[in-house]
Amino acid sequence: MDSCRMTTEVILHYRPYENDPKQLAKIAENVIQDFPTHPLPRFIPWFPYDESKLPLKPERLPPVISEEAAESVKQYLAISEPGVKSQSYDCTVDLLEFQPSSKLQHFIQSHTVKEQTNAAHLDKNSGKEKQHKQRSWSVSLASSHCPEKIFPLSRKLQASLRTLHLHSFHRARWTLEYSVCNNQTLEDIWTKLNRLIRRDELPSCNATIQRQLGQIWVFCDIKCCEYVGNLLKERLSLIGKIDLFVHKYGVIFSM
């Protein structure tokens, strides 16, 4: 009687410095060993159980699928799903430590040259960057002083606050876009705005420039928003309408 033997193919990836044949063979043997299993104890229900009388019975019988229907489903799946060719999976692709030493050395050299080039470029432009450093945020100092020129909020804005149940200390933001800059660049507006904030002329304000969006956001308390909006339009020579935006509510006011 012929005995059947089942062979198992093992592909072992190892690092260049882990090339001991004995250790590699031992690792491969440990991998293909069967995991130890423990037989589960027989389940004994803690409730009265009778196989002939099930406590729960379905109202309807399970659906019966004929062989013809099953075959048609198989054909449909074979047509609709593209055939996937079986290919060996190599988990070491694109991993640098498993690459040949020649490729590794070339990568290290090219990476070093790139870093040196970038460092030289940064040193060359360091003087320019120190002269013109782009700021993204401008924050005013905390001050309890409130300008006397702040008038009560307009009826339209008060009605919006009552409808949305917003407090007068809720934060809002004015959105300044290029369309209201009146032939000025966004950077010019940003420079002028920073001066106003540093001089504490805009109460409770902080601002940020979103260069990728082409916008400047000026945050303030709602109680000061109309005063801030009028001051922005006057001191920055803005034209058109600017929108007051509140998080989760969108634009609630324009002027």
UniProtKB/Swiss-Prot annotation:
Residues 33-88 are annotated as: Sufficient for interaction with MAD2L2. Its main location: nucleus. One of its GO terms (biological process) is negative regulation of double-strand break repair via homologous recombination. The keyword DNA repair applies. GO terms for cellular component: chromatin; nucleolus; nucleoplasm; site of double-strand break. It is found in: Chromosome. Residues 116-135 are annotated as: Disordered. It comes from the Eukaryota. Keywords: Chromosome, DNA damage, DNA repair. The keyword Repeat does not apply. Component of the shieldin complex, which plays an important role in repair of DNA double-stranded breaks (DSBs). During G1 and S phase of the cell cycle, the complex functions downstream of TP53BP1 to promote non-homologous end joining (NHEJ) and suppress DNA end resection. Mediates various NHEJ-dependent processes including immunoglobulin class-switch recombination, and fusion of unprotected telomeres. Component of the shieldin complex, consisting of SHLD1, SHLD2, SHLD3 and MAD2L2/REV7. Within the complex, SHLD2 forms a scaffold which interacts with a SHLD3-MAD2L2 subcomplex via its N-terminus, and with SHLD1 via its C-terminus. Interacts with ASTE1. This is Shieldin complex subunit 3. It comes from Mus musculus (Mouse).
